[in-house]
């Protein structure tokens, strides 16, 4: 085998078809676009356009609104917290709060704080400070001998929400 004898597999590099270059090519005149009209023209189709029929997004009623005061909590379950303690990423003896969890990489970012959820089992006695917790999560922490302190969320302006 020589370097000059190396070739691509048959059909692995297909030549690009140039369209609209005469009827003899097989892709002339309409260039594979069918007949005339809007679909034969260049440009983006009108999204949601249904040929003049009232589009679905206008037939359905408007619902809801975006609450500008909505708080965005990072959620963490008990099983994930226990994994972090077992992996020594979080110290079980210290107070566990949003800053500790973000620094340990347990939660990616805590925009308005952390909310504790009750999936999984907890074996360690913990002192946790979070901005929200489900009743099963609080019960599981207290069953393991720990405490949960619920903090008041603080908005960007520095006032309590």
Swiss-Prot record:
List residues traversing the bilayer. Answer: none
Gly residues: bias regions: 21-37
Region listing for Disordered, in residue ranges: 1-44
**Acyltransferase: is it a keyword of this entry?**
no
Keywords of the record, alphabetical order, are: Ribonucleoprotein, Ribosomal protein, RNA-binding, rRNA-binding
What molecular functions are annotated in GO for this chain?
A: rRNA binding; structural constituent of ribosome
What are the recorded Gene Ontology BP terms? translation
One cellular component GO annotation, for this chain's record? cytosolic large ribosomal subunit
> What Pfam families is this protein classified in?
Ribosomal_L27A
| Family label | Belongs to the universal ribosomal protein uL15 family.
Question: How does this chain assemble?
Answer: Part of the 50S ribosomal subunit.
Summarizing the function annotation, the protein's role is: Binds to the 23S rRNA.
Cited HAMAP family: Ribosomal_uL15 (MF_01341)
In Swiss-Prot or TrEMBL terms, this protein is called Large ribosomal subunit protein uL15
